[in-house]
Design a protein with these regions (language model features):
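Helix-hairpin-helix
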Residues: 192-213, 225
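Long, charge-rich intrinsically disordered scaffolds of nucleic-acid metabolism proteins
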Residues: 79-199
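Short glycine-rich phosphate-binding loop at a beta-alpha junction
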Residues: 52-63
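Phosphate-backbone recognition surface of nucleic-acid-processing proteins
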Residues: 208-282, 286, 313, 318
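Gly/Thr-rich phosphate-binding beta-strand-loop-beta motif of the actin/hexokinase/Hsp70
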Residues: 2-25, 107, 208
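Basic, amphipathic alpha-helical segments enriched in Lys/Arg and hydrophobic/aromatic residues
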Residues: 281-318
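Nucleic-acid-processing active sites and adjacent nucleic-acid-binding tracks
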Residues: 25-54
């Protein structure tokens, strides 16, 4: 294959457990490699020849990370795309057929047409903390499922569930200990953690999730902060039609943690308790009121981190 320098070259990568399907647009080059160290090295070497403007790969959980790390080490520009955005793009094109090759072509087309912003890798410690928070959430979900089974199983089977619950409890405690140690190992995280936890309702897990999954907090404005976690209401209007404003998008892992934090804050923090009650009295549904409180919480936390100040209820209760 001849090398060609073209600033408009976009690469789409469809990720599978065992294989990567790669399409280079507009050169109409398609090839596959195994999703292992050897295959990824070959893919990066080939892609680098064409000096792409952007390489786009969908976020699949963890399968894409070895390829992304290789791109970062090779100083290749990459974007980790939200699969929902790519799916909507396919819908706009009217594309329903689905094969690995077509998916790679679609992702490359999405890259060329939408030009999504380039991604950056998190520092190792931040990625480690994000992984720990994710793993803790996974363990909590499995623990909840086992607790639910304990309620419906006969006594002779309940005895097989109790040791599993003990195992989950111990593993969760170990994960939490690792999170605390990781925060203590980094002065920047220590400072952020102290500010975040000064707000009643924000505990160590919520603080760790914000630090690792929302590193922009403190450097952005209020609207951007709300949008990043998906609690900014979006208008749905067209002509005379005025639909109900709804939240969408954002980073669900942070939103979920803050939702749980708000459940605590509404009981123990007078500012959010009063806000919640006021919204209910105004006729707002409970879930809408909770989301509004979360939006208020993230705006306040953003300003606290920006100004480097601790939580002081009288100053923010307005």
């Amino acid at each position: 294959m001849k090398t060609k320098t073209n600033q408009n070259i976009n690469v789409g990568v469809d990720t599978g457990k065992f294989q990567l399907d790669i399409y280079i647009r507009p050169l109409d080059i398609y090839f596959t490699v195994e999703n292992n160290e050897k295959g990824i090295k070959e893919a990066v070497k080939t892609i680098k020849k064409y000096k792409p403007e952007r390489i786009v790969i969908e976020a699949t959980g963890r399968l894409e990370m070895p390829f992304i790390l290789a791109c970062a080490n090779a100083k290749l520009p990459f974007t980790i795309a939200n699969p929902v955005h790519v799916k909507r793009f396919a819908g706009a094109l009217g594309q329903r057929a689905k094969t690995d090759k077509l998916d790679a072509q679609l992702i490359a087309h999405y890259s060329e047409a939408i030009k999504p912003p380039l991604s950056k890798l998190k520092p190792d410690t931040m990625q480690a903390m994000s992984d720990l928070v994710t793993r803790r959430n996974q363990l909590l979900n499995m623990q909840t499922m086992e607790k639910n089974r304990l309620q419906i199983m006969p006594k002779e089977l309940a005895m097989t569930i109790k040791p599993v619950l003990t195992l989950f409890k111990n593993q969760i405690l170990k994960i939490e200990e690792k999170i605390v140690k990781l925060i203590d190992s980094c002065p920047e995280y220590q400072a952020k953690n102290m500010i975040l936890q000064s707000m009643t309702g924000i505990g160590k897990i919520a603080a760790a999730s914000i630090i690792s999954n929302l590193p922009e907090l403190g450097y952005i404005n209020s609207k951007q902060a709300s949008a990043l976690i998906g609690v900014a209401p979006m208008n749905r209007e067209s002509g005379r039609f005025k639909g109900q404003r709804k939240i969408q998008g954002g980073r669900p892992q942070v939103r979920t943690v803050l939702y749980m934090a708000m459940m605590s804050a509404m009981q123990s923090n007078p500012v959010f308790k009063a806000t919640y009650q006021r919204l209910l009295e105004a006729g707002k549904p409970k879930k809408v009121a909770i989301i509004a409180c979360i939006r208020k919480m993230i705006v306040i936390l953003n300003s606290m981190l920006r100004d480097g100040v601790m939580w002081e209820a009288p100053k923010v209760n307005n």
